[in-house]
Curated annotation (Swiss-Prot):
This protein is involved in the repair of mismatches in DNA. It is possible that it carries out the mismatch recognition step. This protein has a weak ATPase activity. PANTHER family: DNA MISMATCH REPAIR PROTEIN MSH1, MITOCHONDRIAL (PTHR11361:SF34), DNA MISMATCH REPAIR PROTEIN MUTS FAMILY MEMBER (PTHR11361). The lineage of its organism: Bacteria, Pseudomonadati, Pseudomonadota, Gammaproteobacteria, Pseudomonadales. SMART domains: MUTSac (SM00534), MUTSd (SM00533). ATP binds at G613, P614, N615, M616, G617, G618, K619, S620. Pfam families: MutS_I, MutS_II, MutS_III, MutS_IV, MutS_V. Belongs to the DNA mismatch repair MutS family. It comes from Pseudomonas aeruginosa (strain ATCC 15692 / DSM 22644 / CIP 104116 / JCM 14847 / LMG 12228 / 1C / PRS 101 / PAO1). Gene3D superfamilies: 1.10.1420.10, 6.10.140.430, DNA repair protein MutS, domain I (3.40.1170.10), MutS, connector domain (3.30.420.110), P-loop containing nucleotide triphosphate hydrolases (3.40.50.300). This is DNA mismatch repair protein MutS. PROSITE patterns: DNA_MISMATCH_REPAIR_2. One of its GO terms (biological process) is mismatch repair. One of its GO terms (cellular component) is cytosol. One of its GO terms (molecular function) is mismatched DNA binding. The gene is mutS. Keywords: ATP-binding, DNA damage, DNA repair, DNA-binding, Nucleotide-binding.
Amino acid sequence: MTDLSQHTPMMQQYFKLKHQHPDQLMFYRMGDFYELFYEDAKKAAKLLDITLTARGQSGGKAIPMAGIPFHSAEGYLAKLVKLGESVAICEQIGDPATSKGPVERQVVRIITPGTVSDEALLDERRDNLLAAILGDERLFGLAVLDITSGRFSVQEIKGWETLLAELERLNPAELLIPDDWPQGLPAEKRRGVRRRAPWDFDRDSAHKSLCQQFGTQDLKGFGCQNLTLAIGAAGCLLAYAKETQRTALPHLRSLRHDRLDDTVILDGASRRNLELDINLSGGRENTLQSVVDRCQTAMASRLMSRWLNRPLRDRAVLEARQESIACLLERYRFENLQPQLKEIGDLERILARIGLRNARPRDLARLRDALAALPDLQNAMTELEAPHLQALATTIGTYPELAELLAKAIIDNPPAVIRDGGVIKTGYDAELDELQALSENAGQFLMDLEAREKARTGLPNLKVGYNRIHGYFIELPRVQAEQAPADYIRRQTLKGAERFITPELKAFEDKALSAQSRALAREKALYEELLERLIGHLAPLQDSASALAELDVLANLAERALNLDLNRPRFVEHTCLHIEQGRHPVVEQVLETPFVANDLALDADTRMLVITGPNMGGKSTYMRQTALIVLLAHIGSFVPAARCELSLVDRIFTRIGSSDDLAGGRSTFMVEMSETANILHNATDKSLVLMDEVGRGTSTFDGLSLAWAAAEDLARTRAFTLFATHYFELTVLPESQPAVANVHLNATEHNERIVFLHHVLPGPASQSYGLAVAQLAGVPAPVIQRAREHLKRLETTSLPHEMPSQQSGKPASPMQSDLFASLPHPVIDELSRINPDDISPRQALDLLYAWKMRV
């Protein structure tokens, strides 16, 4: 620590406080500014684009300094939090008028990316999560806290791959890991990673602190008693939250045990490829959520995002949601609910700020308005017969006493902050009313007093006045002073007048001189009392907020079902996926022409479709729409199809498109193979797999062989698979794999121009239309013409070469010119003798590397 003796008393105070918070930027309150010094000032000046200056000297050197006005701090804090910085807010808690030496200061809260709760610093449509992990490569404990809602969950996860996929789903703003973990672990590639002392994860201490927080003897009631790693992580989160908030956390009331087996698992690649709530460019437009989310409240939009990113496998829950949506669609009942739900606002985060004791006056006004809207909402719900909706109505309840309390206490349009008062309504508190009246109506009181005293004494020249030295007084001319009543007490003698004070005027003086400051202090005290009373009702209010958010989502899904022509899917016990007239919910919204709907049939007999057809023909759209229909069904929503019948799936995999992972040192093909390996290792007969153009990132031989072997492996696994490819050789797979069928996207050529029809038809495609697509893309005409010449020559010189599945003597399916025929080589002879059914994917990969060395 710096030698404090070299510095001024004020800077000594600063260094002592900064020493306690070395990792945070210190916002040090000085009058109307927050000042930053030394390295904090340099960093803030760069990040916030503010002026770096100097404040005199301390220790013989100029002090780098940067400052921001305290009344506009929110905007700067928001920018710092988005950049991943943490800030310690140091306020003046002493009175400058009475302080000897520097005004007493104290860090009142720490703002970090994962614990921020201020409305202005948050994205209202996204969860803001704090996470912690503990364990090793075999088993991890993961704890997740949303301090802005009170949701607190734990789970245990096997292996880095599953953990990283879960972290990508959660996308925490801040991630805590033990300080004794080795450097460079996969988790550290994420944003907002902070190392904490190993003892912060101590499991015994964590168990004790969690039980104390929830008021229980143990954690058995939460179903996580034996999750020792997760409990250690949760204890670290709780300690970190208390450290940063500097207050109790009454809105953290329970711990939820999340289980991956209860959900449809999507890895990071699948979530990105399906563009659930973030598109491939990082924006929110043209995503699934942008189409299906018309929720009235921000808390419902966040719940919708959680549903989309964590589909369920609980058929009872899903069918209860479906029944609720159907009920809300009857007689357009959702239309009666949505305007009333809009009045509720973001109740979830308002209640969290009340629990954190940093709720602002407008939060209480919004809570008042929300509670006032509940009776009408309850009346509208009385006709809803669906059991799940009735249960939600019971949980929502009404709070007439709290609604009345807030209506009496808070003015209609309060200011943003309590700092300057003007929040509490007149008539709520007699003492406050009197103080405010004294402060605001002192002049009128003095005029009334003067009139009364003139009438009482009969002295017409009597005056009531005030000066800063002697205070309030009654003044009489010297000649009338002897006629002053007995209760007049002499206060000051002037040359031509005498000044007096009376007990009534003295009492008024005592009140009036301090009325403004006392009124503000009283108003702040009343505000704190309001918060305390609300905290006493926090548990049922939070339950109501959760139920209101779910009701909003269900009403939204009913509205979307009506306006997007969605229909109720049916879950069945036998394994199948049947879709009639399925549509892509996002693509059809942006098309200027009608979307071409298509069917899909997968069941016990057909587990895989090999999809061929031209580029831009609709293969990827067809596959993605299938995944989105399945996903929507697994959140309980209606789906964009005329009819859908399906069994529950355990995972949705997508291998669609790739790009280089330059930061990770991985090529496009390496990324593609990593995703393929993940699918081959983890797909089951209950999974849905989308494979698009596997093998295109390497040489023709390698790519075709890998695609072939991967398709055969998935066929043996019996996962529901859509396998799109331009390797027409793969269309012979049904001859060796009975559970595989061919379909194609049709197109036609007219005047050497391609016309995409987008219909999915049985059987393989007859040609690829590659040159027509190139022409459509704007490839120069001479290049297209030269390509046609090359194509004709290749078609005449390349003879069909017998593929493994044709050795039975069956005729080959239509395909492009064989890629092997014009390239005689010993490797081809070896390849022709191999039966792909007899080798594993690993053996195929080994052979490819061996052949590559020889070619």
